[in-house]
Each structure stands twice: as C-alpha cells, then as structure tokens.
Curated annotation (Swiss-Prot):
Keywords attached to this entry: Cytoplasm, Histidine metabolism, Lyase, NAD
Protein name according to UniProt: Urocanate hydratase
Subcellular location: Cytoplasm
Biased composition (Basic and acidic residues): 463-472
Biological source species: Pseudomonas syringae pv. syringae (strain B728a)
Protein EC: 4.2.1.49
Cofactor note: Binds 1 NAD(+) per subunit.
Class of the enzyme per the UniProt entry, highest EC level: lyase
Region of interest: Disordered: 453-472
Length: 565
C-alpha cells in the first residue's frame, strides 16, 4: 500500500454508534423540498427500522451501503443542506465529489456506484478498492437512497408466487408450501409474500437476529425449533389450508440436502440468500457467523472457496427437487452462477424467476413503482392508496394487493407503499399525488421511485435479462440510456450502479426518484419522467422482439423508429 493510500485508509470510519432517522413534518433542514427529499431518504435508508446494519452504513444485500464511510455521509448531509435549486451534487461510490451549477430542471443529485471497467469488474478487484476506501457497493436501492424495507420487494415476490401458482397449481396455493432460504432485507419479503399468495412457507435463515427482526415486523409468523418441528408445522397448516410462514434457524446448505434425503416434497422451491457475495453474504456450512466474519478479513480467498462449495451443495439439492417434478426457480441472487463456478455444470437447469414468471409484465412497462411520505404520517399513504384505487378502478388484483398491504405490512421508517403499475398508469398516479400535495390533502410532499429491478433499467443476464428472445441478455446500453433519459427528463435524483442483486461483473442498472412538491414545475417533470422511465422498458423489450411490448408501444404511441408502427 502506498503512503498516500495508507493515509487514506486511516482517515475514514466505517463504524459509528448512534441512531440516524429522517426528519418528519414540514419544517425544512435543506433549502427546498427538492434537496430535503434526498436528505430524508438517505437518512431513512439508515433508520434502524430499515437498515440491516446501520452503524456500518449497511442497508441490505450483504454490504449494500448508503454512503462510503461516515465522513462521506456527513459531507453528503452538509452538501444537501447547502445545495441550491440550480445546483447538482455528484456522488461517486458513496462519496460526495462535487457540486456544479446546472439548472432548476436538472437532477439535484447524480449518483454512480460500484462501476468498474468490465475487465476489472470482479469481486476480487472491488474488494481491494473497498478495503482502501476507494469504492462502495451500492446494491440497487441502498446507494441510491430509495430503500423502503422489505416491503420494497414484497409485491414482486408476491406476483412471482401468484404467477407460479397459476402455471403449476391452477391458480390456487391453498394447502401448498414454499421452501426457501434467506431472511435479509430482500429475502425477508418471501414469507409474507407467500402468505399473501395463500401458501405456507418454510424460511431457512442462519442468523437468529434476522429471524427476530422479521417476526417483530410481522413478515414471519412463527419459528420452529428444528427441522422435525418445522415439517410437522408445515404438515398441520397445509392440511388445515392455512397460510402460515415458519422460520428455521440453520444453514440451507445443510438443511436442503437433508430434506432431499428424507424425500420431503415442497410445492415450490427458491432461494434468496445473499449468494451474490460469497465473502460477505453466504455462511459456509459448519461455520458460525462470527467465525465467518472474522475469517473473511483474515483469509478471504478460503472463505470465498468454502462459501461457493456450500452453495454448490445447496444448488444440487434444488436441482434434485426440480428433477422430482417440483417447480424450482432462482430468485435473482446468482446462486446458480456461483455453483457452476465450482463444478455444478447443470446449475442453470432450473430457470430464473424473470423469464419464468415476470417478463410479460416487463413487456408492458409494469414494475415496482414505489412512493414514500416525507411527512412521516401514515395517513398520507392511506390517502394515496385510495387515489390509486380511484384512478385504476378495474384492477381487482391491484386493489387486493393494496388491501393486503395495509393490513399486513408494517411500515419501516418513513411510511411508504409499493405497487406494480405500468406505462401510462405511473404518470397518472404521479400527477395525482402532486395535485394532492398542492391541495393540502397530503400533509407534505412525497417522493416516487422504484427498484432498479424494472423493465428498462437493468442488464443482468442471470436475472432480469436472462434468456432474452434475441440473445441480448448482456447488452448494457439499455440501463445507461435509461439513466441518461431520466436525467434529461428532470428526475430529482438519478443513479447508475453495477453489481446489484447478482454481484460484481454480472449486472448494470439505473434508478430514479422524483419529488411531488405540489408545484406546476414538478408536474411538468413528473409527466416527463414517469412516462419516459417505463417507456424505456417497453422500448427495450419491443427491440428484443416481444410481441406484447410491440403491441404496448403501438397502443401508447411510442416513437420507436425501428419498430413497425
């Protein structure tokens, strides 16, 4: 390490005790709502109700952080409080690096996280940079300041389970059960999603603290003492037709093979451990969590090897379930790739969830539309729920989702909601929310964003763009164009990341957030952004030859020069 890097290494802090929470109400800390919004959402990402490990700036997904270190966090906060409405803050891998004069319709923040030149886009190189304080893993919504807790993925998981039920069980999951693992920020959505879809679930998690958190937030119903107890509960509840979620503390690489040996037959098998990051996110079998964390620092290469070997056993068990005729699918954590790298040559014999169940939605620009109430008042969300029903009156499935979400989903941090809606609907809802702020029906502005897992904002050959019809799985021009268009359209902040969901070298993706502050200027920006953003998804899928997307483009009047109009 050079002398300069040695100084850099000593000059930053990853761990700091204390509680970060976003302000509530209408009193501003920043100069306007356009800068108050990213400030509150950054802080909300680190709220103890939201983040997995807030003292180390980790929001979710292994080491997905909101800022590179605490010094950078403090400077981001300072910069946002001082930022004028004709200036733009640039954030490079969680570090505020510049403030530039732009104009009032430009984004207030532009973020680039974890991006590496392709030849160097590996965990090994990233971890070297990370150790020197030169990079930060932003996951998808951690480093882009629009994570809303496990609710953010609940509906996508719910839609997946419902569609799997339609395809395999005549649309009825009553008396069925899902086997899965991982109860972190993303995987924690699975038990509740299964329950809402009408199924029981057995959810394996190696950290008791995560099980405790999911039970506290009502994402998990109960915990079993051991595998025998878990299977007995599953047998009882499925026989009774109840949809109950059960957590089991243990290692999936040990428990799934044991279930195969016993001849246990779930009705659906998937996984959402943090397998994308073998150094930080997947516990090798036979190890304790404390041992894993210590050895990841002292002997990272051996830790990665051990984690991948355990993943191989995990995937082999999933393959055995599939070969027994049980619907089995990857839920986007790249576990198949990790297993393949250590010799499981047929790891990709079971599909990813997007080509299996979700792509028809993406073809219509339908994806994870989310919003948060900057007031902190849950009533603002309930009023927007009602507005969604009013503006989309004939979608019974969506109405059921909103009713179930209100009944079952606990808000984490600032109250927020997610619902999957598409091109045309997003702009209508955004303009309506803005009018509700203008009229005073909502007590403060709201922000509208989305996951990077959306129809036009990601290139990820092992997840969102797996098995594209034209073979364009790895073409990453599309998320770059999405980020550029959202910037040109006037989103309040725009992000461009690498490695989210599936790890370094396997994805590029972009995000946007826009503020509804009740002004005419906001309405103009909302109309542009919330049309153009999902339209890029329709464009991307139409370009790949999907008839559903081509029809949608024609219906919505999109100008796609190479697509016959």
């Amino acid at each position: 390490m050079t002398e300069n890097n040695q100084h850099l290494k000593q000059d930053w802090t990853r761990h700091r005790e204390g509680v970060v929470r976003a302000a509530r109400g209408t009193q501003l800390t920043a100069k306007s709502w356009l800068t108050e919004a990213p400030l509150r959402m950054l802080m909300n990402n680190l709220d103890p109700e939201v983040a997995e490990n807030p003292n180390e700036l980790v929001v979710y997904g292994g080491i997905g952080r909101a800022a590179r270190n605490w010094e950078c966090y403090d400077k981001i906060v300072e910069s946002l409080t001082q930022l004028n409405d004709d200036e733009t803050l640039l954030v490079q891998s969680g570090k505020p690096v510049g403030v530039f004069k732009t104009h009032s319709n430009a984004p207030r923040v532009l973020i680039a996280n974890s991006n590496l030149v392709p030849h160097w886009a590996s965990w090994e190189h990233f971890n070297e940079l990370d150790a020197k304080g030169l990079a930060m893993y932003g996951q998808m919504t951690a480093g882009s300041w629009i994570y809303i807790g496990s609710q953010g993925i609940v509906q996508g998981t719910y839609e997946t389970f419902v569609e799997a039920g339609r395809q395999h069980y005549d649309g009825n999951l009553k008396g069925r059960w899902v086997l899965t693992a991982g109860l972190g920020g993303m995987g924690g959505a699975q038990p509740l999603a299964a329950t809402l879809a009408g199924a029981c679930s057995l959810n394996i998690e190696c950290q008791q603290s995560r099980i405790d958190f999911r039970i506290k937030t009502r994402y998990v119903d109960e915990q079993a003492a051991d595998l025998d107890d878990a299977l007995a509960r599953i047998a009882k509840y499925t026989a009774e037709g109840k949809a109950i979620s059960i957590a089991l503390c243990g290692n999936a690489a040990e428990i799934l093979p044991e279930m195969v040996r016993r001849g246990v037959r779930p009705d659906m098998v998937t996984d959402q451990t943090s397998a994308h990051d073998p150094l930080n996110g997947y516990l090798p079998k036979g190890w304790t969590w404390d041992e894993y964390r210590a050895r990841s620092v002292s002997e990272p290469a051996s830790v990665v090897k051990a984690a991948k070997q355990s993943m191989a056993e995990h995937v082999e068990a999933m393959l055995a379930f599939q070969q027994a005729g049980i619907p089995t699918f990857d839920y986007g954590n790249n576990i198949r790739q990790m297993a393949k790298e250590v010799g499981v040559t047929n790891a990709f014999d079971f599909p990813g969830f997007v080509p299996a169940y979700i792509r028809p939605l993406f073809c219509r620009g339908i994806g994870p539309f989310r919003w948060a109430a900057l007031s902190g008042d849950p009533q603002d969300i309930y009023k927007t729920d009602a507005k969604v029903k009013e503006l989309i009156p004939d979608d019974e499935h969506l109405h059921n989702w909103l009713d179930m979400a209100r009944e079952r989903i606990s808000f984490q941090g600032l109250p927020a909601r997610i619902c999957w809606v598409g091109l045309g609907q997003r702009a209508r809802l955004g303009l309506a929310f803005n009018e509700m702020v203008r009229s005073g029906e909502l007590s403060a502005p709201v922000v509208i964003g989305r996951d990077h897992l959306d129809s036009g904002s990601v290139a990820s050959p092992n997840r969102e763009t797996e098995s594209m019809r034209d073979g364009s799985d790895a073409v990453s021009d599309w998320p770059l164009l999405n980020a550029l268009l959202n910037t040109a359209s006037g989103a309040t902040w725009v992000s461009l990341h690498h490695g989210g969901g599936v790890g370094m070298g396997f994805s590029q993706h972009s995000g946007m957030v826009i503020v509804c502050d009740g002004t005419d200027e906001a309405a103009e920006r909302i109309a542009r952004v919330l049309h153009n953003d999902p339209a890029t998804g329709v464009m991307r899928h139409a370009d790949a030859g999907y008839d559903i997307a081509i029809d949608c483009a024609r219906e919505q009047g999109l100008n796609l020069p190479m697509i016959g109009r």
